[in-house]
UniProtKB/Swiss-Prot annotation:
InterPro entries named among the record's database cross-references: QueA (IPR003699), QueA_dom1 (IPR042118), QueA_dom2 (IPR042119), QueA_sf (IPR036100)
Protein localization: Cytoplasm
HAMAP family referenced in this protein's UniProt entry, alphabetically: QueA (MF_00113)
Primary role: Transfers and isomerizes the ribose moiety from AdoMet to the 7-aminomethyl group of 7-deazaguanine (preQ1-tRNA) to give epoxyqueuosine (oQ-tRNA).
Organism phylogeny: Bacteria, Bacillati, Bacillota, Clostridia, Eubacteriales
Classification via Gene3D superfamilies: QueA-like
Recorded catalytic activity of this chain's protein: 7-aminomethyl-7-carbaguanosine(34) in tRNA + S-adenosyl-L-methionine = epoxyqueuosine(34) in tRNA + adenine + L-methionine + 2 H(+)
Name under which the protein is recorded: S-adenosylmethionine:tRNA ribosyltransferase-isomerase
Associated pathway: tRNA modification; tRNA-queuosine biosynthesis
Family per record: Belongs to the QueA family.
């Protein structure tokens, strides 16, 4: 298949620049993957589509304030580091801007010296391995000095950091939010539990590769970035019991989906596991674990719209996206949601 098969017209004004005041007041498009039928709802109505005994799978990763803006020791020249992933205790793989300043051996300082950094390696892809020096706990230092790494298509400043976190975020490590989960409130999750639906958590730390465009024409040639995931025995057991009963496993977001499909065996069962995944799900792939999906509206030609098209059918998805544009749905991270049933 060709990348162009997943292109669609999107007016720029439909790209949501800020979250809605009430998380679950966003719109919800319900798409029947068998018939292609579309219904327009509010996100809170999702509960109507979840049945007793079903299991909802959420990604509890937490976005780090991973943008650090500082200066070069000696000259005061400006530098920006974006932390991508931890290599070992105080060494991180980072994007550096401007790259020419971040040579091996160069030292930088942040927050009037509260945090210092030295570039120890330049990788083939241009990323830097950076060692950090500080007093206390790194996460606390980062929390006080770092900024949220918002996606490149969001141009407005985020007033409240917590609006780019899910209400159940727990495990620090992401460079971007698992945005399908942003629509849930604590009250809605409690209502879902009260209806007899299981809620389980896994962790996948979202990397910046999620925003990288597909640069090859043929999907078969695209290589995904690797991301760290973790599924507990408790969550795995509940998912397996759900499959045995014939109930639905409903994945919240493409990140939860990619984790479940990485771990799942040919019978759709999962086990306690952690590791790195670079699974790329595109049409032709047969889902093993995930039956239904809650997701946002994605970028044209992105790996995310390809995953969604694999579950619901490309034609159904492209029709649904055309209708979403006509109905002026809000797109991308702070936008509206879709439920594929």
């Amino acid at each position: 298949m060709n990348v162009k098969d997943f292109d669609f017209y999107l007016p720029e004004e439909l790209i949501a620049q800020h979250p809605l005041e009430q998380r679950d007041s966003s719109r919800l498009m319900v798409l029947d993957k068998k018939t292609g039928e579309i219904k327009h709802k509010k996100f809170h109505d999702i509960i109507e589509y979840l049945n007793e005994g079903d299991t909802l799978v959420l990604n509890n990763t937490r976005v780090m304030p991973a943008r650090l803006i500082g200066e070069k020791e000696g000259t005061g020249g400006k530098i920006e580091f974006l932390l991508l992933k931890r290599i070992e205790k105080d060494r991180w793989e980072c994007l550096a801007k401007p790259g020419k300043s971040a040579k091996v051996g160069r030292k930088f300082t942040f927050g009037e010296g509260k945090l210092k950094a030295e570039v120890v390696e330049v990788e083939e892809n241009g990323n830097r391995i950076v060692e950090f020096f500080y007093d206390g706990i790194f996460e606390e230092v980062l929390d006080s000095l770092g900024e949220m790494p918002l996606p490149p298509y969001i141009h407005e400043r985020l007033e409240d950091r917590e609006r780019y976190q899910t209400v159940y975020s727990k495990e620090n490590g992401s460079a971007a939010a698992p945005t399908a989960g942003l629509h849930f409130t604590k009250e809605l999750l409690q209502e879902i539990k009260n209806k007899g639906i299981n809620i389980v958590y896994l962790t996948l730390h979202v990397g910046l590769g999620t925003f990288r465009p597909v640069k090859v024409e043929s999907l078969e040639e695209h290589e995904m970035h690797s991301e760290f995931y973790m599924l507990s025995k408790e969550s795995a057991d509940i998912i397996n019991e759900t499959k045995k009963r014939g109930n639905a496993v409903i994945s919240v977001g493409t990140t939860s989906t990619r984790t479940l499909e990485t771990i799942g065996d040919e019978n759709g069962f999962v086990k306690e596991q952690s590791g790195w995944t670079n699974i790329f799900i595109y049409p032709g792939y047969k889902f093993k674990v995930v039956d239904k999906l809650i997701t946002n509206f994605h970028l044209p030609e992105s790996t995310l719209i390809m995953l969604v098209s694999t579950l619901a059918g490309r034609e159904n998805v492209m029709n649904a996206y055309e209708e979403a544009v006509n109905e002026k749905y809000r797109f991308f991270s702070f936008g509206d949601a879709m439920f594929i049933k």
